[in-house]
């Protein structure tokens, strides 16, 4: 839940975040580092001391300067970089993850940080492969546009599996058939508004119905600070997602918002903590069976005509009915399929 995107004073930012979360009694399981903190071992040490995992931003670029520095005896033709169809000496920055040496490059880029305690993170920019390129597996860019994501995801899976024994989490914004075997997904850059939240529930349920069960969002939007009410509804929404995480350029730290936000943050933080065993167990079940962690109403209740087309409710982990409030309102009409429903927050029962 924590964010540290600061390029300056990363140690001070990390220390302050840990102290303030501790004061609230809501210590996060992960702090996301981007900027100076991602390369500072002291920041990792502070997190490790509190048993907080560190994640970072990743992209698929292999920079020529880095490649020449680390592979001085090789020319571009031999490097795991995407080549121009007409001139193999002309390379794009995109890593060629079909190449046998791609994993060794990732180890050089990320290996030291993984040894410090890095445990995955965002794997970004998965949809930009140029058409006029050729890969080591012989396929051209027009055929690899989607499939590159599969190789990209597998490369990071192989990297972290080998170096951490499987104790990691990576999530991508791109996907293709089969890439969910290697990584999770997040629904991409979103607006910091109620409309942005509505887009995420549609995107997440579409992902789930397509076989991508484990997903999350940039809580509260990518850019600029959301209004307090949007933050609250986004946080409640994320509580009932497979992956609960913050993200984006603007702060999502609760103390940067009003008192009501902080109270809601604490309440739903502990609700999530108490649901974790169920969520973890159902994630394993979902991975083995293909049954989504978030089921659209039509999928969960195919016999109910009233459920069809309902895009603002879903069933989470097979037994929690979640109904979003994605507008400035305190109440919402909720459709309850036949059965007995118990409130999570009081002793109310609906039949």
Residue ranges and their predicted role:
Residues 1-351:
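Catalytic-domain carbohydrate-binding cleft regions of carbohydrate-active enzymes
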């Amino acid at each position: 839940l924590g964010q540290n995107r600061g390029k300056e004073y990363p140690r001070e930012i990390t220390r302050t975040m840990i102290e303030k979360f501790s004061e609230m009694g809501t210590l996060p399981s992960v702090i996301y580092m981007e900027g100076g903190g991602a390369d500072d071992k002291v920041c990792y040490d502070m997190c490790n001391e509190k048993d907080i995992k560190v994640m970072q931003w990743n992209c698929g670029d292999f920079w020529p300067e880095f490649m020449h520095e680390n592979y001085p005896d090789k020319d571009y033709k031999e490097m795991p970089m995407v080549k121009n169809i007409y001139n193999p000496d002309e390379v794009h920055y995109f890593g060629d993850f079909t190449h046998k040496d791609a994993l060794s490059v990732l180890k050089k880029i990320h290996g030291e940080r993984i040894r410090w305690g890095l445990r995955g993170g965002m794997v970004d920019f998965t949809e930009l492969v140029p058409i006029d390129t050729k890969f080591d597996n012989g396929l051209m860019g027009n055929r690899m546009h989607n499939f590159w994501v599969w190789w990209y995801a597998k490369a990071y899976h192989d990297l972290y599996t080998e170096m951490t024994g499987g104790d990691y989490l990576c999530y991508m914004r791109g996907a293709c058939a089969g890439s969910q075997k290697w990584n999770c997904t997040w629904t991409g850059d979103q607006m910091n508004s109620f409309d942005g939240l509505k887009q995420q529930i549609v995107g997440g349920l579409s992902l789930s119905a397509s076989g991508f069960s484990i997903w999350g969002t940039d809580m509260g939007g990518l850019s600029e600070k959301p209004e307090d009410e949007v933050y609250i509804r986004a946080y409640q929404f994320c509580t009932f997602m497979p992956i609960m995480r913050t993200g984006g350029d603007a702060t999502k730290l609760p103390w940067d918002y009003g008192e009501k936000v902080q109270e809601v943050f604490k309440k739903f933080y502990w609700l999530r903590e108490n649901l974790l065993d169920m969520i973890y167990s159902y994630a394993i079940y979902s991975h083995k069976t293909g049954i989504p962690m978030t089921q659209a109403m039509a999928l969960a209740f195919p016999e109910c005509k009233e459920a069809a087309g309902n895009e603002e409710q879903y069933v989470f982990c097979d037994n929690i009915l979640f109904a979003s409030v994605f507008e400035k309102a305190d109440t919402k009409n909720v459709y309850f399929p036949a059965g007995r429903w118990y409130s999570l927050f009081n002793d109310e029962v609906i039949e």
